[in-house]
A protein has these predicted regions:
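Dynamic "connector" segments at or just before major functional cores
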Residues: 1-202, 207-211
Length: 211
């Protein structure tokens, strides 16, 4: 292993007789974040929310949580999965540090979300450039346009949460509106944006789709 200037170590595979690293599949995500410039873009975007004496950058905390979710986590405490693999994921904040960071960012949620969205847009361009013919924009024409799928998806909340409401399916939770770019018949949808909405939001609310 050798350190990089980004958030995550550069990991190399060898055949040395050492213990295996759990959750190593997340390296695909951390490598993508570094190669596309997402990590430095996030760092610049959220630098204003970093306290002078802070050890863990807010952007690193958020990207760690994104990796945790991808590895199957469903709460902040599940970041322990990657915290135990410091050689693979670098220093990961404690549960208390993560909680304080999220609380601080949530206090200025509108600006934070705007900054994160800008960082993601900045990283998407090099990602699609590296994808070449597999990029969703490859071969797009007026007669073969890029398709963006808007989908309202119900997410169940198993306990009382902020903005969790009864849904039209007689459940309880959230009803975000998601935008995915189509990768064609052999690919999957790539999330472009998501509008967070309470569970009682409509599936075909015109104002939400326009926004």
């Amino acid at each position: 292993m050798k350190k990089t200037t980004g958030f995550y170590p550069s990991v190399q595979v060898d055949t040395a007789p050492v213990s295996a690293a759990g959750s190593a599949g997340g390296v695909l995500l951390t490598t993508a974040a570094e190669v596309t410039g997402l990590s430095p873009a996030m760092a610049r975007a959220l630098d204003g929310w970093r306290k002078p004496a802070a050890v863990h950058h807010p952007a690193k905390v958020l990207t760690d949580l994104a990796v945790t979710l991808a590895l199957g986590g469903d709460c902040l405490a599940d970041a322990a999965v990657i915290r135990s693999e410091a050689d693979v994921y670098g220093p990961v904040g404690s549960e208390a540090t993560i909680s304080r960071t999220i609380t601080a960012l949530a206090a200025d949620a509108h600006r934070v979300l705007k900054q994160v969205a800008a960082a993601r847009r900045a990283a998407r361009a090099p990602a699609w450039a590296l994808a070449g013919e597999r990029a969703p924009t490859h071969g797009v024409t007026a007669t073969d346009p890029l398709i963006v799928d808007l989908d309202a998806t119900l997410i169940t909340a198993h306990s009382d949460k902020e903005e969790a409401k009864p849904t039209f399916k007689k459940g309880f939770g959230f009803h975000p509106l998601c935008a995915f770019v189509d990768h064609g018949p052999d690919g999957t949808g790539e999330p472009l944006a998501m509008q967070l909405r309470p569970g009682n939001a409509g599936s075909n609310t015109a104002a939400d789709h326009i926004q």
